[in-house]
């Protein structure tokens, strides 16, 4: 069997005109080969060009300083955030970069840039509509009909979250095994639209981001209302995958990789929503007695 | 309310993650703005006579979310460097590149 696999590998190499020793990005091909095929090389990462990261308070909010330079967004605007905690978290992201700047790990910075630049040019109504639209195909509402163990798992894990959301907002959501998904009443949509309208633009960017990651508005509401932790929400979003992993085995470089990435993005989005919607007010308690 | 575990555990986890982040720079994590902010926030919400204080729960939730963020980024980067760091194609066509990473990754995936 192994000899057959090796033979197939050789056939594959010959079809792509690859040499026997394999090809790395740094090797060149000889001039006699017609079409050079190189492995994909991602664009060079930017080196860390600053020593110190600090925050300062300006007119529009908190700014990030990389040495003496003020951080700017991709569109050139001054990077300003409304909350000190968010500014500190963004500064920590920049300070934790080592030799090269790995933008794919800087989720809070990316969310702030999106809120400041608004590259998709969407207004508040459009963001709310985009988030509520996910309810039609919400992960926790879409049920399978077999195998029985997965059906039971979905019922046990997802039904309580849907019941909570229905009670919390006084709406009907339900679930469905139909390919078209659940039929969401108009009143449910109205109530959720008006609830989301109470958030500011920045928080809505975060909410829409989390909804897109988890493929579920119900789970996102669970996060914004402190009903679910990030780990719980991600597990519920990936319920079927986790079920298959339990059955067939885990592949670290695929499953764990995706799990950690989803956790990181969801955690960043959730934290972003909370930090953009809070207002710190010191209330002194009256001393009694 | 979400089951968060004990605030002390979250606090310890945050300190650990801040230590990892600052290990490369060699700077003590107690010098960072993040550490100072977290100390101030945890202290401010410690004194309360109410059993269920919403503000306290909110702070703990945010702290646990931040801990999840730091931990999952660290583990994601570690997985990226171990399995995807050489820039080769991922997934089923790894074997075409002839790189040493691909066969090991496939082997690891089939371990019981």
Swiss-Prot record, chain A:
Entries under SUPFAM superfamilies matching the protein: ATP12-like
Membrane topology annotation: Peripheral membrane protein
Pfam families, sorted: ATP12
The keyword Ribosomal protein appears for this protein: no
GO terms of biological process kind: mitochondrial proton-transporting ATP synthase complex assembly
InterPro entries with a match to the protein in the record: ATP12_ATP_synth-F1-assembly, ATP12_ATP_synth-F1-assembly_N, ATP12_ortho_dom_sf
Domain of life of the organism encoding this protein: Eukaryota
GO CC annotation, single: nuclear speck
Transit peptide: 1-40
UniProt keywords, alphabetically: Chaperone, Membrane, Mitochondrion, Mitochondrion inner membrane, Transit peptide
Residues with the N6-succinyllysine modification: 133
Subcellular localization, as worded in the UniProt entry: Mitochondrion inner membrane
Family statement: Belongs to the ATP12 family.
PANTHER family in alphabetical order: ATP SYNTHASE MITOCHONDRIAL F1 COMPLEX ASSEMBLY FACTOR 2 (PTHR21013:SF10), ATP SYNTHASE MITOCHONDRIAL F1 COMPLEX ASSEMBLY FACTOR 2/ATP12 PROTEIN, MITOCHONDRIAL PRECURSOR (PTHR21013)
Job description of the protein: Plays a role in the assembly of the F1 component of the mitochondrial ATP synthase (ATPase).
Binding partners and assembly: Interacts with ATP5F1B; involved in the assembly of the F1 component of the mitochondrial ATP synthase (ATPase). Interacts with FMC1.
Name of the protein: ATP synthase mitochondrial F1 complex assembly factor 2
Species of origin: Bos taurus
